[in-house]
Each structure stands twice: as structure tokens, then as C-alpha cells.
């Protein structure tokens, strides 16, 4: 039994749905007081701050499972305060205060090293809106940084994620189906009509 290719109307509907989802996700992320990006190994956060702030005016705390960035003082503005979705390596993580050419004039740049360098984060802190990590396509340069075995595992994970998303079998499921088909071909005398597979 062969599966039909999706019609152009189906593809157009999926594409429109995806654009709408992406626009909603971007709108949610735009409301955050910071911007963030990630690779499979780390997360970078930038927080625009007032040009008159100095490093000593800031209270930046990076722990294994949480982050807090605020202006010092009892009523100091809090930029981010919450739990990470996954642990970081505090000793490998850092922050700097940098001058920028665009207003408000400075930004806090935070670099977080992930403990598990094989997973994507859906958000920086668990109270923030999530992004759809299944839509992340890492740059080839970051994949090429990985050793052969790790790269193969990441590519397999990405393939399996896309397959699940489309309702198609993962690489492991496909391999099992291929083995079963081969076995059925080699043993036509066996009746598989009542077999429960899965």
C-alpha cells in the first residue's frame, strides 16, 4: 500500500499554518525583556540596559539551575529571574556589559554552557513562553564542530523529530519494518494477517 503525496492545497495549508505558528512564536518572544539564541552546546542571552549602568550596578547570578539579572538595590529592575529548563555549567558560563550603537546604549551579554550538549532548550527560564524546538535547524558549521559519532547521533535525532512531526516512522521504526518485510518475503508460507506489530 503506497501513501499518496500531499496535494498542493495541503502543502499550501501546512505552509500557511507554519507561518502563522512562527509569527505567533516570534511575537511571544518579542515581549521578553531579553533576546536569546542557542546552539546545541550553549545559550546566549542579551539584555538591553540603560547606558548609564555600570557592571558594579548589576546583580548577575548564574547558578547550575537558575539565573537572576537585576539592578542592585531593594527596588532594582529585574530583567530575568527564574529556573533553567536544563542545568548549565556555571564555571564555564559568563556575562559582560557591552556598549552598543543602538538605544538604550548598553547590553548585558550572557553566555551559558549547557550540561547536556545534546538537547535544545524551549526557553531560557521555565516561566517564559516556549519555542518549538522541533523546528530548529542547526547551522552546518555547528554540526561540523561535532565529532563523527556525535554528529551522526544529532542528525538521526533531527531526522526522527521531523519524521514524528509528519506522522511518519522514525529511523528505528523504519528499520524494524524493513526487517519484518524481509522476513515475510523470506517466509511466504507464514501467515502474518493476525500479527500484532508495535
From Swiss-Prot:
One annotated GO molecular function is: unfolded protein binding
Instruction: Write out the biased-composition intervals (Basic and acidic residues).
Output: 12-25
Phosphoserine modification, residue list: 141, 193
What are the residue boundaries of the CS domain, all occurrences included?
A: 29-125
The record, for Pfam families, names: CS
Locations listed in the record: Cytoplasm, Cytoskeleton
Q: What is its main location?
A: cytoplasm
Gene Ontology process terms (BP): cell division; fungal-type cell wall organization; karyogamy; nuclear migration along microtubule; protein folding
Show the InterPro entries listed in the entry. Answer: CS_dom, HSP20-like_chaperone, NudC_fam
UniProt-annotated stretches for the region Disordered: 1-29
- What does UniProt give as GO cellular component? cytoplasm; microtubule
Q: Which UniProt keywords apply?
A: Cell cycle, Cell division, Cytoplasm, Cytoskeleton, Karyogamy, Microtubule, Mitosis, Phosphoprotein
Lineage: superkingdom:
Eukaryota
State what this protein does: Required for nuclear movement. May interact between microtubules and nuclei and/or may be involved in the generation of force used to move nuclei during interphase.
Family as reported in the entry's similarity comment:
Belongs to the nudC family.
Cross-referenced PANTHER family, in alphabetical order? NUCLEAR MIGRATION PROTEIN NUDC, NUCLEAR MOVEMENT PROTEIN NUDC
Q: What is this protein called?
A: Nuclear movement protein nudC
Q: Please name the source species.
A: Emericella nidulans (strain FGSC A4 / ATCC 38163 / CBS 112.46 / NRRL 194 / M139)
Q: What gene is behind this protein? A: nudC
